[in-house]
Each structure stands twice: as structure tokens, then as C-alpha cells.
A protein has these predicted regions:
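Short, surface-exposed, charge-dense and proline/glycine-enriched linear segments
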Residues: 74-94, 151-158, 228-238, 266, ...
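A conserved SF2-helicase RecA2
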Residues: 178-278
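Low-complexity, serine/threonine/proline-enriched polar segments
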Residues: 63-117, 250-257, 266-269
Length: 279
């Protein structure tokens, strides 16, 4: 039975690989962030949402069906034992199998339904239309607005910051900041010289053990790589900022006290720690 249990775990893990998990996490976050976006729109703000993948969406890796097992492809070679465990699993975890959690659509599909007329910036959108979408977002006359930006397409070359003070900017990142330098570029779309209101930046966190593991391992490795490439103290500050942000995850609602505050103070403290040699 132990070998058959390992076979079932292998079946699930093969269905639920790294990329599939990232798709699912992003789909869940896209669904959960919708009420937060609506709150900010109601306050007259313009909202930027970054996502990692154009495709994706949820699926249920735990919806297992009985199957014919190739003895050479399994550790136990016992189809009856494997299918027996699958039947037990389906009975004990029927609520998990039927959960709506796994039915979420990709961010693009979901947002096009929830926010008709949403502005898109991604590789599937012609360059001319992307420029028009950015211009419309930046136009105060368009009012509170949502723009959905795919990470690679929007990491540089576009400005989405508030230059007039009429519509404060909010940025939600549905992906994981697995590339610190890219995350900095994304934040720079609304947080840069010339902004006249505080930029509000939020990273979504599902709180799952898998996301904690993915965040901890990837950020530690890549931020350290940036450090080793010569960024020194500043790279360490970037890594610390991401870690503290992840640890401080919470249900921050629109309009809360201190919203959009504190980032510059942290940046200054990090900058003050840099030696003249590092400068």
C-alpha cells in the first residue's frame, strides 16, 4: 500500500507541475483581487495590475479518476491498490474536488468579464493599441481606470505614474516577484520622478505552503545572484524588502490609514547603509 500511495502522489505531482501551479495561483489571485480593485476605483484611483502569463487559469489536480496502470510505469505495479486509494481519496476529499477554487479563469479572461473596456498591455496586443491604451490610462479625462499589464510587455518603456494628482495610482502584482530586477522595473511604472501622489503597491499572497516555498527559494537565489553581480548592499536591501513585504502580507483595504506610506523611508534607510565604496 505504501508503494501505491507513492504512485498516487506521483500522478498528482505530474499533473500539478511548477507551471501549472503558477497558472493556478495567478488565477486565484485574479479572482480574489477584484473586490480590492473595485474599492480603489470607487475612491477615484487608477489601478495597474501586473500578471505573469497570458494563458493559464485554474484546474483541479486532485480530480483523479481510476485508470489502467502500466506496471512498468508505477512503483507498486498494482492497479487495484492504486485505484482503491483513488476511490478513498475521492470519498474523503469530495469537497476539495468540487471546490470553485480551481475553476478560476486566467486574469485576462476574468478581468474582461469583470471590467468591460479594460485596457490591455501584452504581447498579443498590437504595439499601436498598447500605446493607445497607455495614453488613455494616463488621460485624467478617462476617470478611474484599470489596465492589465503582462510582466514582460510592461516592465519598461511605459509610464503610468500620476503626474497631476487627480487620480492616485495603485499597482497590484498577481505574479510572484521571482526576478527582483523585473519587479523593480514594474514598480517603476507608477513610482518614479514626477509623481505627485503616493504610489500604492500591493503583492498578492495566497498564504499556501507551496507559494511560501517558491517565494523563499527563488527570491533568495535570484536576489543573491544580483548581489553577487556587484550590486552589493543595495541588492541585499532589495532582497530584504521583498522578504519583509511577504512576511507583512495582510488584508489591506482601500483607504486604510498609512496607505502608500513608508516606502521612501525604507529606501532612504537602505541608501544610508551603502558605503562610499559601494556608491
Amino acid at each position: 500500500r505504501t508503494a501505491a500511495m507513492r504512485d498516487v502522489r506521483k500522478i498528482i505531482s505530474e499533473k500539478f507541475d511548477y507551471l501549472s501551479r503558477r497558472y493556478l495561483l495567478e488565477a486565484i489571485k485574479a479572482q480574489e483581487v477584484i473586490p480590492h480593485i473595485r474599492e480603489h476605483l470607487a475612491m477615484g484611483r487608477k489601478v495597474v495590475v501586473f500578471h505573469d502569463y497570458n494563458k493559464g487559469g485554474g484546474f483541479n489536480p486532485f480530480d483523479l479518476s481510476e485508470r489502467a496502470i502500466d506496471a512498468e510505469m508505477s512503483e507498486s505495479g498494482d492497479a487495484e491498490a492504486i485505484n482503491g486509494i483513488i476511490r478513498e481519496f475521492r470519498t474523503e476529499f469530495k469537497d476539495l474536488i468540487s471546490s470553485d477554487l480551481f475553476k478560476a479563469s486566467s486574469p485576462i479572461t476574468n478581468f474582461q468579464i469583470e471590467f468591460p473596456g479594460i485596457l490591455l498591455v501584452n504581447g498579443s496586443v498590437p504595439a499601436k493599441v498598447r500605446r493607445e491604451n497607455v495614453a488613455k490610462f494616463q488621460d485624467d479625462a478617462s476617470g478611474p481606470q484599470v489596465i492589465l499589464v503582462q510582466a514582460q510587455a510592461g516592465k519598461e518603456g511605459i509610464s503610468l505614474h500620476d503626474t497631476t494628482g487627480k487620480h492616485q495610482r495603485v499597482l497590484f502584482n498577481l505574479g510572484q516577484p521571482t526576478q527582483p530586477t523585473m519587479a523593480m522595473q514594474q514598480e517603476g511604472r507608477i513610482y518614479r520622478m514626477g509623481q505627485v501622489s503616493d504610489a500604492i503597491i500591493r503583492y498578492l499572497n495566497t498564504g499556501t505552503n507551496w507559494e511560501k516555498w517558491a517565494f523563499a527559494t527563488t527570491i533568495a537565489q535570484r536576489a543573491s545572484a544580483a548581489e553577487n553581480l556587484g550590486s552589493g548592499e543595495m541588492a541585499r536591501a532589495i532582497k530584504d524588502a521583498f522578504i519583509s513585504g511577504f512576511e507583512e502580507s495582510g488584508d489591506y483595504r482601500a483607504g486604510m490609514e498609512g496607505e502608500g506610506k513608508g516606502g521612501k523611508d525604507r529606501d532612504k534607510a537602505a541608501n544610508d547603509a551603502i558605503s562610499e565604496y559601494d556608491r
